[in-house]
């Protein structure tokens, strides 16, 4: 079964780095990578494609990551979608807010590609 992973970030280089990192999962999973450049586009992809895992930046144009996370977590049709918040905001209050909204993890940029792979594998294997 194909695992869909959505990357939502307005920074092109971050999206590219995440894509390159997550392509390594193809050794263990049938993976389809999807990308969006802002919160509205990300939410539209979530509605249409129901990804298994979403890497979601917090500070983006049009709709921030907290708002996308809130909408997804409050709507039962999206049960099972796991969100990892990625941000340059490293303050404890920001992390706490994201986790309280239902995100599975809160990671700060710059991120460790090995940690991204481990967390992704763990969350995708929970579904299997």
What are these regions (language model features)?
Residues 12-34:
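Two-component/phosphorelay signaling modules centered on CheY-like receiver
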Residues 35-44, 65:
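Helix N-cap/capping motif at the beta->alpha junctions
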Residues 44, 66-79:
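Short amphipathic alpha-helix used as the core "switch/output" element in two-component signaling
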Residues 49-55:
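Active-site beta3 strand of CheY-like receiver
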Residues 60:
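Receiver (REC) domain active-site loop signature in two-component systems and cognate sites
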Residues 67, 90-105, 117-121:
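Alpha4 helix (beta4-alpha4-beta5 surface) of REC/receiver domains from two-component response regulators
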Residues 109:
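A Lys-centered signature of the CheY-like receiver
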